[in-house]
Amino acid sequence: YKREIAGNVGACIRLSANTGLALNLIKPFGFSFQENKIRRAGLDYHDLASVSVFENWNNFYSENKDKKICFLSVKGSQNIWDANLNEYDYMIFGPESVGLPDDILALQYETLSIPMNDNSRSINLANAVSIVSYEFLRQNYKN
C-alpha cells in the first residue's frame, strides 16, 4: 500500500518471481513505476512475477472485501511466528516511512507484527515482505 521506494518494489517483484507468490501493489506510488531503480532491483524477473496494480485502496478493498485480509505493522497485536498465515488471502504492508494509516487499521482486520528489538523503529519494507513470505511458505512446506 502506497509504496515510496522504487528499490523496495523491485526487490518484492524479484521475491514474487522466486517464490511464486503474487504481489499486489496499491497506488499512489512515490515514484514512477517505470523507474530504473525498480528494474535494477528486480533484475530480469519482471516477466516471471505475478504483479497486480490497484489504482487506490478503495479499488483494492471493493474487489477484495470478502477475502481474508491481515495487516502487518509494528502496532500488531500478534507476531507472525504465532499466527497461522494460511488463514489470509492478502497481507497488507504500509508505506515505508509511516506504516499503515489509522483509518485503514480501523477496519478491524488482524494486525500482525514481525518480532524485533524493542528499541528498533521498523524493518526495511522489502526485508519485511521477505520475512513474512518465507514464514508463509515455511508454514505450507510439505517435504
Task: Put a short name on every predicted segment.
Residues 1-143:
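Post-transcriptional modification and biogenesis factors for structured RNAs
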